[in-house]
Amino acid sequence: MDVCVIDHPLAAARLTVLRDERTDTAGFRAALRDLTLMLVYEASRDAPRKSVRIRTPVAAAAGTRLVNPPLLVPVLRAGLGMVDPAQAALPEAEVGFVGVARDEQTHRPVPYLAALPDKLAGRPVMVLDPMLATGGSMAHTLGLLQRRGATDITVLCVVAAPEGLAAVGETAPDARVFTAAVDKGLNKAAYIVPGLGDAGDRQFGPNLFTSSAPSRPEAPAGRGRAAAKTPGRRSARSESPSSTSPSARSRKAAPPA
C-alpha cells in the first residue's frame, strides 16, 4: 500500500482550521472543500491522459484530456462534503455512494447503503472520507468495490490513524492513500487523537440516525433482475460487511435525507 501525506503550507493551514474546535460548520465545510481539492490534485497527478488538437481564438494548439476518469465514492455522511470539490476538479467523474453508520456501544460499522455500478473492472475509483480511524467502514467500502471488480482504488482522507491505514493495507494491499496527516492513534471512543472530532457532525450538525434503525430492504426481485440485465447500472441496497472487515468504526454517519 502506498501512503502519501500532503506536505504543503496551504494544506497545513486548512487542516488547522478543521482541527480547531472554534471553527463553525460553515468554516469547516469551506476548509474541507479547499483541502479536498488539494488531495484530488495530488491523487490525480499520474492520471492517464491523451493528447488532443484544439483551436484557440488565434491558432491551432495541442491540448490534454483525461482518459477513463475515476468513479467518486463518498462514504456517507461525512464524505458528502468532499464530493463537490472533487467533481469540480474532475467534472467528467461519476459518483457512487456507500452509507455506513456506527454502533456507539461497540464502534462496529453498520452498513445501510451501497449505490454503485455493478461492474468496476478496469475503472479507477476514488473513495472520499475525511476520517480514516479504525478502518472498519473503509474496509467495508473497499470490499464492496473489490467484489465489483475494482482494482485501481485511491483513498482520500483528511486525517488518518495508524489503525485505519493498517486496515486498508490488509483489505486492499494495492490501494493508494492520500491524506493531510497521520495522527498518533485512537482514544477509547475510537476517535482519532488529536484528530478533528466527528467530521459529519461538524459539517451538518448532530447525527440523529442510530444503529438501532432497521437496514434498508433489498430491492424487489423484479427490479434486481432488471438491473442485472443492464451492465453498469447502479444498484442501491444494504450490504453487510465482509468477515475480514475490522470491527471498529471511527465516527457516525447518517442516511441521506
Curated annotation (Swiss-Prot):
Which SUPFAM superfamilies has this protein been placed in? PRTase-like
The EC category is transferase
Where composition is biased (Low complexity), the residues are 211-230, 238-248
Tell me, what's a Pfam family for it? UPRTase
> Which GO molecular function, any one, fits this protein according to its record?
uracil phosphoribosyltransferase activity
User: What family name appears in the similarity comment?
Assistant: Belongs to the UPRTase family.
Q: What job does this protein perform?
A: Catalyzes the conversion of uracil and 5-phospho-alpha-D-ribose 1-diphosphate (PRPP) to UMP and diphosphate.
What pathway does the UniProt record associate with this protein? Pyrimidine metabolism; UMP biosynthesis via salvage pathway; UMP from uracil: step 1/1
Copy out the cofactor comment.
Binds 1 Mg(2+) ion per subunit. The magnesium is bound as Mg-PRPP.
Q: Which domain of life is it from?
A: Bacteria
User: What name goes with this protein?
Assistant: Uracil phosphoribosyltransferase
Binding residues annotated for uracil, in chain numbering: I192, G197, D198, A199
Tell me what reaction this enzyme catalyses.
Answer: UMP + diphosphate = 5-phospho-alpha-D-ribose 1-diphosphate + uracil
**Record text on activity regulation:** Allosterically activated by GTP.
* Record-listed E.C. numbers: 2.4.2.9
Binding, 5-phospho-alpha-D-ribose 1-diphosphate: R77, R102, D129, P130, M131, L132, A133, T134, G135, G136, S137, D198
Taxonomy of the source species:
Bacteria, Bacillati, Actinomycetota, Actinomycetes, Mycobacteriales
Assigned keywords, A-Z = Allosteric enzyme, Glycosyltransferase, GTP-binding, Magnesium, Nucleotide-binding, Transferase
Give the range the annotation lists for the signal sequence.
none
Could you tell me which InterPro entries the record lists for this protein?
Answer: PRibTrfase_dom (IPR000836), PRTase-like (IPR029057), Upp_B (IPR034332), UPRTase/APRTase (IPR050054), Ura_phspho_trans (IPR005765)
Q: Which GO terms describe its biological process?
A: UMP salvage; uracil salvage
Q: Which parts of this chain are annotated as the region Disordered?
A: 203-257
> Which metal ions or organic cofactors does this protein require, according to UniProt?
Mg(2+)
